[in-house]
A protein has these predicted regions:
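General helical secondary-structure elements
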Residues: 7-10, 40-41, 62, 78
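Negatively charged, low-complexity tracts enriched in Asp/Glu with abundant Ser/Thr
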Residues: 1-29
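Positively charged, low-complexity intrinsically disordered regions
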Residues: 12-15, 35, 46, 83
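A short, structured beta-strand/loop element
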Residues: 31-57
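Mixed-charge, Lys/Arg-enriched low-complexity segments
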Residues: 2-3, 50-93
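Generic detector of low-complexity/intrinsically disordered segments
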Residues: 11, 21-24, 34, 61, ...
């Protein structure tokens, strides 16, 4: 079992400003890490206790990094992460 956490393959942070009557200030962090032969996509709100994660295998690092960028650029909510990636990847483990 690994005890040293490897650096993420990619990381993006989306900041949301407070807009009275519309939304509260928030921050969502998107991270892609490799865990042995699996890739782990995760997204976490600043206010959430734990990130939402999606593990997949059989995907190269470069396309996975582009998928993480897609999640960030399209402001995919952490609550939607698994559904969006399941559609893009076709399966999960």
């Amino acid at each position: 079992m690994k005890t040293v956490q490897e650096a993420p393959l990619a990381r993006y942070v989306r900041e949301y400003s407070a807009l009275p009557g519309l939304q509260q200030a928030d921050r969502v962090e998107y991270i892609l890490c490799r865990h042995e032969d699996m890739l782990c996509f995760s997204a976490r709100r600043k206010t959430a206790a734990a990130p939402v994660s999606f593990y997949t295998a059989g995907l190269e690092d470069a396309p996975a990094c582009r998928m993480l960028c897609y999640l960030y650029e399209n402001s995919i909510a952490p609550e939607q992460l698994r559904d969006v990636l399941a559609d893009l990847c076709g399966w999960t483990l």
